[in-house]
Amino acid sequence: MNPLTNIKNIYFIGIGGIGMSALARYFNTQGVVVSGYDKTPTALTDDLVKEGIRIHFEDDINQIDKAATVVVYTPAIPASHYELNYCKDNGYNVVKRSDVLNWITENAFTIAIAGTHGKTTTTSMTAHILRHSGYGCNAFLGGIATNYGTNFWSHEKNVVVVEADEYDRSFLKLAPNVAVITAVDPDHLDIYGTAEEVLKAFGQYTDKIKSNGVLIQKYGTEFPINTANKEVFTYAYKEPKASFHTSDLKVIDGSYQFDLVHPKGIVNNVVLNMGGLHNVENATAAMAIALQLGIDENKIKEAVASFQGVKRRFEFKIKTANKVLIDDYAHHPEELNALISGVRSLYPNEKMVLVFQPHLYSRTQDQAAGFIEILSKADEVILLPIYPARELPIPGVSSDILLDKMTVAKKTVMRSEERRVGKECLRLCR
């Protein structure tokens, strides 16, 4: 029996995380009593409270709902966490977020988008196309879809679109009908150890595809694949050898217009009102999924044109005739490269000032050479102190290891990020 059947009260440790909050919203819509802990209040936890979910911000076992029968946590929670250990030691059914996603998706038609970058926008765009076209889906997103102001929505149709997270090998708990792989660049080496282990995990992910399922992978990604009992397609921004690719790309009034070439024909004059050439490629993947599902081409075009993006993914904060401020979550060298290329494609003659906060000590150390090369493509770089997230500091690893070797003419490290970042951005946009 699926464990979902008997859940009446559920507790989340780390409820404010983007993936955890989507699950909390799911159970809340199902009439389950939902509560949880997080370290810091945020706009997202504020929204959850407004939706009727009780949240506290102290690691305090007295605030755990003792009626909860399932406790969910993420790998971001440290092993020493008091509440987590209390629940493990006192008979609660303690499971990871990935286990719960497995319960939700195992009996559904599941579309899972994985990749070391690009998956959040691709997942959000795919879910938007299915929703806007009337096809319908339940969506579990790794970001806040701007069109809807949320990372989750439900639908009576037993179709799930889910972002498949490779961190901690969580995506291996899923068994999708349609699997997408956007990128396999080395990342999370604190978990995997080597780039080879990352590729091996993506190969294992393709083994999880249900019989007669579909794999859609970015053209040029190479990793071990078992092609038995599945259709395999490729996609790319403009590689003509890919099953799905773009052609005749133009920039018109700040938007992209292109044709989508696919195995059965061409979808002409697609309009994407979202910056970044990498997002043209993400749109190609999302449209490939929709075409595989048999959604009408005109409905797909309408949906893509109406897609407003994802919060912190090439998000325009200021857009005037002479100043533009873009907020983006890019935290891997390839993501940064895509961001810079996308900005240059829209504003080829403008000065680019890049304010960058490295994410994780381990990633900064492992990817330092890539960060140095890509950051040097900007005209000016302002670095912030490393955001540690789940990690403790690593001796000798700071933003200075990037600063010292960048070849950009103007560069600095902002030693205290509070307030000064906002003031600096406002100064740049005056």
Give the label of every model feature segment.
Residues N2-N9, G19, L23-Q30, I252-G254, ...:
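Nucleotide phosphate-binding/pyrophosphate-handling subdomain across enzymes
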Residues P3, F12, Y26-V32, V49, ...:
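Phosphate-binding loop of NTP-binding sites
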Residues N9, T69-V70, V178, V214, ...:
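Structural motif
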Residues I15-G16:
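Glycine-rich Rossmann-fold phosphate-binding loop(s) that bind the pyrophosphate
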Residues G31-D47:
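NAD(P)-binding Rossmann-fold cofactor-contacting core
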Residues Y37-D38, H56-D59, V95-D99, F140-G143, ...:
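Beta-strand->loop->alpha-helix junctions that form or flank phosphate-binding loops
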Residues R54-K66, E417-R420:
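Short acidic low-complexity segments
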Residues I372-K423:
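C-terminal helical cap/extension that packs against the catalytic core
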